[in-house]
């Protein structure tokens, strides 16, 4: 794991610790206890804010909103007990493969 991954893993560990905590103790515990629909709603809101920030083109806003999106994505992963390492592994698998080849390798539905 490199230095950039460390902060994501550290945040994920805190999210996992908050999973069983009282909803009164933290925003994260409260969000996790409200359930998947609330988590997904918040994730959608944050994704929209990234889009708006991207359209505005202000670097600080893009960074700020992307950090929120990363955080709420980690909350989703924590809810389902998916370690970020699984995402890193999938990205490593795709790295160096063209998007067209990667899409062609997906199972047909």
Swiss-Prot record:
<keyword id="KW-0378">Hydrolase</keyword>
<dbReference type="GO" id="GO:0005737">
    <property type="term" value="C:cytoplasm"/>
</dbReference>
<protein>
    <recommendedName>
        <fullName>Phosphoribosyl-ATP pyrophosphatase</fullName>
        <ecNumber>3.6.1.31</ecNumber>
    </recommendedName>
</protein>
<dbReference type="GO" id="GO:0004636">
    <property type="term" value="F:phosphoribosyl-ATP diphosphatase activity"/>
</dbReference>
<comment type="similarity">
    <text>Belongs to the PRA-PH family.</text>
</comment>
<keyword id="KW-0368">Histidine biosynthesis</keyword>
<keyword id="KW-0028">Amino-acid biosynthesis</keyword>
<dbReference type="InterPro" id="IPR021130">
    <property type="entry name" value="PRib-ATP_PPHydrolase-like"/>
</dbReference>
<dbReference type="Pfam" id="PF01503">
    <property type="entry name" value="PRA-PH"/>
</dbReference>
<dbReference type="InterPro" id="IPR008179">
    <property type="entry name" value="HisE"/>
</dbReference>
<dbReference type="GO" id="GO:0000105">
    <property type="term" value="P:L-histidine biosynthetic process"/>
</dbReference>
<comment type="pathway">
    <text>Amino-acid biosynthesis; L-histidine biosynthesis; L-histidine from 5-phospho-alpha-D-ribose 1-diphosphate: step 2/9.</text>
</comment>
<keyword id="KW-0067">ATP-binding</keyword>
<dbReference type="GO" id="GO:0005524">
    <property type="term" value="F:ATP binding"/>
</dbReference>
<keyword id="KW-0547">Nucleotide-binding</keyword>
<keyword id="KW-0963">Cytoplasm</keyword>
């Amino acid at each position: 794991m490199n230095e950039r991954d460390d902060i994501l893993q550290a945040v994920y560990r805190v999210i996992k610790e908050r999973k069983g905590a009282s909803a009164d103790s933290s925003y994260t515990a409260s969000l996790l206890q409200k359930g998947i629909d609330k988590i997904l709603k918040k994730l959608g809101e944050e994704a929209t804010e990234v889009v708006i920030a991207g359209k505005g083109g202000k670097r600080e806003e893009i960074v700020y909103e992307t950090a929120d999106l990363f955080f709420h994505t980690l909350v989703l992963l924590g809810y389902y007990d998916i370690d970020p390492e699984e995402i890193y592994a999938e990205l490593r698998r795709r790295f160096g493969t063209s998007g067209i080849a990667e899409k062609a390798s997906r199972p047909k539905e």
